[in-house]
């Protein structure tokens, strides 16, 4: 994996944005607030389940998957939200996957992409997303704040992704209410759950926190449960032969 993966993907995103048209803004799909839902679920660790056919770190994960059936299983198993990869080049996703899944389920859906422009946000909303991802490492603080405010004004919720303390401070500073801690370093692609554990002492009481990446086992979920409201899990579920059982295994009671 290239040491400058993030910069490589951001250059690709700039090229994609240049080709995007200005879509008229539609209404946000009706569902519950992810923030409100996670705030109320104090006794159980929730799961954000991901539809991800491939990734730069793992290669092809499950290319033949029926994404709508996978989404149906996620919702039936009690997922808090479904994350859908919309990046085509690096993750073999598609905005049409987001549209298909959002049309099918009643729970929130997350547009999982490297968002750098308002046009991407509008496209995600129009495809049925109720939550978008903004990555602190991908944007200047000023630009992050602009896109955060833009999405919020449209009625979307925003998952702001961090990886270290300085990024967490930025997420807090811009007023993010749903904050992700990515255990994967987007420069080197190395994964460590210690990232989540190290940042947990700096969490604020009026926000919700999601641990992302590298989560495969009940033991790992138990380790993270005291500090996080939810886990974002993709590869473990995409490779599982029993999705419902895997969701149950990771959606543990919080002691």
Where are these regions (language model features)?
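N-terminal active-site wall of soluble small-molecule enzyme domains
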Residues: 46, 59-108, 112-159, 165-170, ...
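C-terminal helical cap(s) of enzyme catalytic domains, especially alpha/beta-barrels
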Residues: 196-203, 239-255
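Catalytic-face loop-and-helix region of soluble metabolic enzyme cores
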Residues: 178-187, 192-225
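Conserved, mostly hydrophobic/aromatic
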Residues: 9, 49, 74, 82, ...
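Glycine-rich phosphate-binding active-site loops on the catalytic face of alpha/beta enzymes
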Residues: 126-143, 180-188, 228-247
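An N-cap/entry alpha-helix motif that binds or orients negatively charged groups
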Residues: 1-62
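Active-site beta-loop-alpha junctions enriched in small/polar residues
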Residues: 12, 50-54, 87, 114, ...
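Catalytic cores of alpha/beta
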Residues: 116-128, 164-174, 211-233, 247
């Amino acid at each position: 994996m290239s040491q400058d993966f993030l910069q490589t993907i951001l250059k690709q995103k700039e090229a994609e944005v240049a080709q995007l048209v200005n879509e008229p803004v539609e209404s946000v799909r009706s569902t519950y607030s992810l923030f409100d839902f996670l705030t109320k679920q104090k006794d159980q660790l929730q799961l954000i389940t991901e539809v991800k056919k491939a990734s730069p770190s793992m290669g092809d994960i499950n290319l033949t998957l029926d994404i709508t059936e996978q989404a149906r299983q996620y919702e039936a198993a009690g997922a808090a939200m479904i994350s859908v990869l919309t990046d085509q080049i690096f993750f073999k996703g598609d905005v049409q996957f987001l549209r298909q899944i959002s049309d099918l389920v009643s729970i929130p859906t997350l547009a999982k992409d490297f968002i750098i422009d308002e046009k991407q946000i509008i496209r995600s909303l129009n495809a049925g997303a109720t939550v978008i991802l903004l990555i602190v490492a991908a944007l200047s603080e000023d630009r992050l704040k602009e896109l955060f405010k833009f999405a919020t004004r449209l009625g979307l919720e925003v998952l702001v992704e961090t990886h270290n303390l300085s990024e967490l401070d930025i997420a807090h500073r811009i007023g993010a209410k749903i904050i992700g801690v990515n255990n994967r370093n987007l420069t080197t692609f190395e994964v460590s759950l210690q990232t989540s554990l190290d940042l947990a002492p700096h969490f604020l009481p009026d926000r919700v926190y999601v641990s992302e990446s590298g989560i495969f086992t009940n033991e790992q979920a138990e380790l993270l449960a005291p500090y996080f409201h939810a886990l974002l899990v993709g590869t473990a579920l995409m490779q599982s032969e029993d999705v419902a059982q895997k969701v149950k295994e990771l959606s543990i009671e919080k002691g």
